[in-house]
């Protein structure tokens, strides 16, 4: 079994296609269950963010595994298979492990160095674990990747490149406004989740005068407004249905609801409003593109941010060095684990031969007393253990090194061993019942 990544991101696909593949918790749970139901896939988890959709799986067959993932994504989204193949990228084995480490470190993000992705990978892992589709292989890779991400953010200055999508969006909005802060401005924040909370916090740091929070659950909107007040920013909460009533009173709108319908369209904006900056942090999009056609209205969304971000931005060398170190440690440990069953089989084979030969000796020399036989038995086992010790230690050391030699296969061929296949970690019959899709 080797790790496989099949995905698309802001680097490979248009936002409109990413929208079609975005998943809420229920869809993600159903999809990982569908993935491990395929014979070629043993474990699976899905990272779904505003600019990324990636399937991580353990597969016994590269080509079949890729095809199975694409078919499941097609069934989930309704997107044509050929269209999917045109935008999906694939990573396999060590390259897949390296990709997850780079993603978790923020090196593959639209804003290099952003930290939100660590939490998003952790959430994807917990979601798949609860769904019963994560086994020891993905568990080990995720833990190694999270450790790598923590090291990168702790030991390098990569955070200076960009704290998050929120800060990047606000910086782009300020650039369009020819301003350095939001002093004297009033804002409407739609949503009360993690992204909306980050937006409210960042607006406060940039000098916003007042924040109005609207959310479909009023209590959550009130909590976010209370947090803003505690942080020293004037804020209030309103019912979500009243969001249009305050449009004429604000200078900035930030929407992060992740709804399936637009929260604001051009028809909702008062004709004589004046300048209005709109920031859409959601995928699928919250704010209709047609708002940008209204005089005085400016729109910053995920697609705009992708165009602004430099896809050729140089990666932090210190961060890349850490990723390389952690990848080598992870892959070395993996190769040692891969050869362990063959080593264990060799020792069992040797023990079986000893038992067989001692039984023959006992039959051929029945006059040997029990003490002498026990001494012969101990001596033979010591000799065999000493003969096997150096080769088994050395084969693990050699296996830890990268290369094209399969030492576990070599041991099996040299000694005629039959190594049992590693059991599948995920039992499809024990998965939770499907969740109703949105």
Curated annotation (Swiss-Prot):
The active site is at 50 (nucleophile). Its EC number is 1.2.1.70. Keywords: NADP, Oxidoreductase, Porphyrin biosynthesis. It is an enzyme of class 1 (oxidoreductase). NADP(+) binds at residues 191-196. Pathway: Porphyrin-containing compound metabolism; protoporphyrin-IX biosynthesis; 5-aminolevulinate from L-glutamyl-tRNA(Glu): step 1/2. Signal peptide: none annotated. GO terms for biological process: protoporphyrinogen IX biosynthetic process from glutamate. It catalyses: (S)-4-amino-5-oxopentanoate + tRNA(Glu) + NADP(+) = L-glutamyl-tRNA(Glu) + NADPH + H(+). One of its GO terms (molecular function) is glutamyl-tRNA reductase activity. The record marks 99 as: Important for activity. The keyword Oxidoreductase applies. Substrate binds at residues 49-52, 109, 114-116, 120. Catalyzes the NADPH-dependent reduction of glutamyl-tRNA(Glu) to glutamate 1-semialdehyde (GSA). During catalysis, the active site Cys acts as a nucleophile attacking the alpha-carbonyl group of tRNA-bound glutamate with the formation of a thioester intermediate between enzyme and glutamate, and the concomitant release of tRNA(Glu). The thioester intermediate is finally reduced by direct hydride transfer from NADPH, to form the product GSA. Belongs to the glutamyl-tRNA reductase family. Homodimer. PANTHER family: GLUTAMYL-TRNA REDUCTASE (PTHR43013:SF1). Possesses an unusual extended V-shaped dimeric structure with each monomer consisting of three distinct domains arranged along a curved 'spinal' alpha-helix. The N-terminal catalytic domain specifically recognizes the glutamate moiety of the substrate. The second domain is the NADPH-binding domain, and the third C-terminal domain is responsible for dimerization. This is Glutamyl-tRNA reductase. The gene is hemA.
